[in-house]
Amino acid sequence: MSKQMEKSALGKKSSGVVLKEITKIFQQPDTGKDFVAVDHINLNIQDGEMVTLLGPSGCGKTTTLRMISGFEYPTSGSVFIGERDVAKIPPNKRGISMVFQSYALFPHLNIWENVAYGLKVAKVSQDEVVRRTNAVMELMQLTGMERRFPNQLSGGQQQRVALARAVVIEPSVLLFDEPLSNLDAKLRESMRDELRALQKRLGITSLYVTHDQSEAMAISDRVVIMKDGVICQQGTPQEIYEQPASRFVANFIGKANFIDGIFKGRDGEAALVEIGGKTFSIPAPGKMEGVQKDGPCCLAVRPESILLSEEEGPLPGRVSRATYYGAKVEY
């Protein structure tokens, strides 16, 4: 399908999303006490941007997604899709689509009927239903499978159908709730790349929820790290990995070795840190909040930044374990 056909058939109503001071409080049924799931979050997602909410279980990422979709209403705050505050508007009036972890396909409908379902509910003309459904079937490489049923497809094919059903209604925002977690590792990687390529082609504003760090790094324009209902840090995947704002972020994204030291001051864009009686100049272009001169600090050193040598180096060490991964050995 040509780029012109894609743009004319799909994704022409994309809008940005803005969250202003969003809070969600649940009452715990056993104790009756309030539980703050999301605590005064502010987030701005640009039109056409792919943003991932990433964090451990219980951090509030899925609740945030559900408040944007309309499946949960915020206790306080505003949810803007484009220029409209939709915080109290039901899901079917928001112009969004959602791709679920479970696919949620109708088992009694064939693939073509599953994809066309949303258009028929919206009372789109039959000619338009046929045109748009056929266009998205071709786009998602489902041509030839129109008369099959969901139980006759593989997991990856079912996920393509779920995605086709989501984009065919031309949503202003596309939401993903851990859509690849039911797939095996190899297929998950393939579908991840396919999904990202589709989003970039169509330019639909997208919010993706996952707890898989590598998935978030691979598909996102921007990653938002959450913990305990608040945003810890947001930035491009490279910014998050290379300039983590806290020990939690450094440890959650990739792997890191943590080394305690004494902060001796700054030298331009570098921090002077004393470790084991020796002073090292460490690249530190960002802010160092809460760190005082001659006070304790912590360095996060990525495994790939450490070079092993039999010759004497600035820091002595001992190899305690080596793990073979095929393409690499991790010490």
Region roles according to the model:
Residues M1-I25, K33, E311-P314:
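ABC-family P-loop ATPase nucleotide-binding domain
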Residues K3, E242, A270-T323:
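Glycine/charge-rich catalytic "coupling/switch" loops of P-loop NTPases
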Residues L19-I22, V36-Q46, G77:
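Conserved beta-strand
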Residues L54-P56:
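The feature captures the beta-strand-to-loop junction immediately N-terminal to the Walker
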Residues G77-D85:
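Conserved ABC transporter NBD signature motif
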Residues P91-S97, Q101-N251:
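ABC ATPase nucleotide-binding domains
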